[in-house]
Amino acid sequence: MAKLDTLKAALEKALGKRVQNLVEATGELTLIVKADDYLDVAQILRDDPSLRFEQLIDLCGVDYLEYADGAWDGPRFAAVSQLLSVTHNWRLRLRAFASDDDFPVLPSLINVWNSVNWFEREAFDFYGIVFDGHPDLRRILTDYGFVGHPFRKDFPVSGFVEMRYDPDQKRVIYQPVTIEPRELTPRVIREDKYGGVEH
């Protein structure tokens, strides 16, 4: 039995109906679970002797608005975790979709894998995914006064405000964005004997 088949069978046996979907692509398995089962599944993935995913390597947020060809009709926001079992030499991708697109909430995995701390803060900062139960869920990379979540696909490229140093006030201030849309039409300059041809 192939390694992925063994892992797939172990996941189905340990998790049962909690498995919403198991996708195999490019030699890796992705386990998709409901938001309500997310925390319980994580606990089982870590503690079940047949699985033993001791390490969470990464977690990131994903915005599925306008996904692929635009035909996505599922929930908009997901948290995707990369897990590693040192015991069994397995890798697994765990994905859970937040049920509310306007206020995405998922349970925090900090009591299962404490390495998720800053990853969840980053997903909150960039995507606005709230991780319920996180002890210090605040912005980690953007400024504290930042408006919005910059990795959301509907966030404007130019942003809402810009910061600059004001020499009169001797401090950094916020002001509305002053970037104006530009028309990027190339300007053609002809040279008289370009390429040896008279123009």
Swiss-Prot record:
Source organism: Cupriavidus taiwanensis (strain DSM 17343 / BCRC 17206 / CCUG 44338 / CIP 107171 / LMG 19424 / R1) (Ralstonia taiwanensis (strain LMG 19424))
GO-annotated molecular function: NADH dehydrogenase (ubiquinone) activity; NADH:ubiquinone reductase (non-electrogenic) activity; quinone binding
UniProt name for this protein: NADH-quinone oxidoreductase subunit C
Record's keyword annotation contains Translocase: yes
Enzyme class: translocase
Enzyme Commission number, as recorded: 7.1.1.-
Membrane topology: Peripheral membrane protein
Family of the protein in this entry: Belongs to the complex I 30 kDa subunit family.
Quaternary structure and interacting proteins, as annotated: NDH-1 is composed of 14 different subunits. Subunits NuoB, C, D, E, F, and G constitute the peripheral sector of the complex.
Its job: NDH-1 shuttles electrons from NADH, via FMN and iron-sulfur (Fe-S) centers, to quinones in the respiratory chain. The immediate electron acceptor for the enzyme in this species is believed to be ubiquinone. Couples the redox reaction to proton translocation (for every two electrons transferred, four hydrogen ions are translocated across the cytoplasmic membrane), and thus conserves the redox energy in a proton gradient.
Gene3D superfamilies: NADH:ubiquinone oxidoreductase, 30kDa subunit
Swiss-Prot/TrEMBL keywords: Cell inner membrane, Cell membrane, Membrane, NAD, Quinone, Translocase, Transport, Ubiquinone
Cellular compartments annotated: Cell inner membrane
Matching InterPro entries: NADH_DH_suC, NADH_quin_OxRdtase_su_C/D-like, NADH_UbQ_OxRdtase_30kDa_su, NADH_UbQ_OxRdtase_CS
Reactions catalysed according to its record: a quinone + NADH + 5 H(+)(in) = a quinol + NAD(+) + 4 H(+)(out)
